[in-house]
Amino acid sequence: MQPPFRSKQEVIINAPLEAVWSFSMDLTKIPEFHPRVVKVDLLSGKTSREPGASYQCHLAGGKHTCIEKDIEIIPLQKIVTVLPEDTFGISKILSDYRVETTFQMLDHRSTKVEISHYYSTTT
């Protein structure tokens, strides 16, 4: 069962869907687009996203890290990621936290990316 929807961010990228998807599938590119991530360790030894691929993100400031794991990939449509472990306590408080990133071609030169957050709370 999926936890409740909590928030969503979206961005329009002036690039074709295939280019945006290809860039997003490369785990080594995360620091290039995520403002809080400065480095990624490939825990699964995989440079590309796939179900089961785990990676550790080092956050800006150097104090915190989080381990993320991709659990579902629908090519050119969706990436589902969970947060099994982190050093700032989110995974303990929100044990079912998951992120669904969806990709939608708007035209041949632009793509909408939506990042939706789901998690349960105790209250």
Model region roles, listed by residue range:
Residues 6-8, 64-68, 94-99:
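Short, surface-exposed coil-to-beta transition loops
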